[in-house]
UniProtKB/Swiss-Prot annotation:
It is an enzyme of class 3 (hydrolase). Its EC number is 3.6.1.9. It is found in: Cytoplasm. It comes from the Bacteria. It comes from Pseudomonas savastanoi pv. phaseolicola (strain 1448A / Race 6) (Pseudomonas syringae pv. phaseolicola (strain 1448A / Race 6)). This is dTTP/UTP pyrophosphatase. The keyword Hydrolase applies. Keywords: Cytoplasm, Hydrolase, Nucleotide metabolism. It catalyses: dTTP + H2O = dTMP + diphosphate + H(+); UTP + H2O = UMP + diphosphate + H(+). Its cofactor is a divalent metal cation. The keyword Cytoplasm applies. GO terms for molecular function: dTTP diphosphatase activity; UTP diphosphatase activity.
Length: 200
């Protein structure tokens, strides 16, 4: 079985892979995440996911059986990518823009080995209830929005803003598990390898 590496510093992605019983090693693979001019959000997340996987593979030059996973998530409102907020004003502007509206969350996952690469893109729709200014300020003060795409974490304190979701909850968090499991299977990596309570 190939050795799986996760080219991501995201604790959410580590937790999600662990949740489905996959054994992996975290790998640091830095790439330039600047969007290209006129690049669509779907093309952007796919390029970054694939770029992370391939950058990770190049770090593991000596390991022939390596398989590297990369992923990237973008919050998209009116066709515009909302990245990680630069500061408090940026975060509050994002939350104000998302307030009372539906937006898209796109996550791409890529797997690469020495012979091939495959990607999947999953788009989900999230609707926020209206967010009051004092709520947005209190949420920023919690520290949670600072390193999150779109300035919020659906699995965290921002759960109280979510009126509805169509699509993949795990995809919104950062790794669509149904599609990820399918990709892993294509590369000969099973889920449920290491389950809690397994005595073997």
């Amino acid at each position: 079985m190939p050795s799986l590496y996760l080219a991501s510093g995201s604790p959410r992605r580590r937790e999600l892979l662990t949740q489905i019983g996959v054994s992996f090693t975290v790998l640091n693979a830095q790439i330039d995440e600047t969007p290209f001019d006129h690049e669509t959000p779907a093309a952007y997340v796919e390029r970054l996911a694939l770029g992370k996987a391939q950058a990770g593979l190049s770090v593991l030059a000596a390991e022939q059986q390596a398989c590297v996973m990369g992923a990237d998530t973008a919050v998209v409102l009116d066709g515009r990518i909302l990245g990680k907020p630069a500061d408090e004003a940026d975060a509050l502007a994002m939350l104000t823009a998302l307030s009372g509206r539906e937006h898209e969350v796109m996550t791409a996952v890529a797997l690469s080995d020495r012979h091939r690469s495959e990607t999947r893109i999953v788009t989900s729709r999230v609707r926020f209830r209206p967010i009051q200014p004092h709520e947005a300020q209190a949420y920023w003060a919690s520290g949670e929005p600072a390193d999150k795409a779109g300035g919020y974490a659906i699995q965290g304190l921002a759960a109280i803003f979510v009126e509805g979701l169509q699509g993949s909850y795990s995809g919104v968090v950062g790794l669509p598990l149904c599609e990820t499991a399918e990709l892993l299977g294509h590369f000969g990596i099973p889920c449920w390898q290491c389950l809690e309570g397994d005595e073997s």
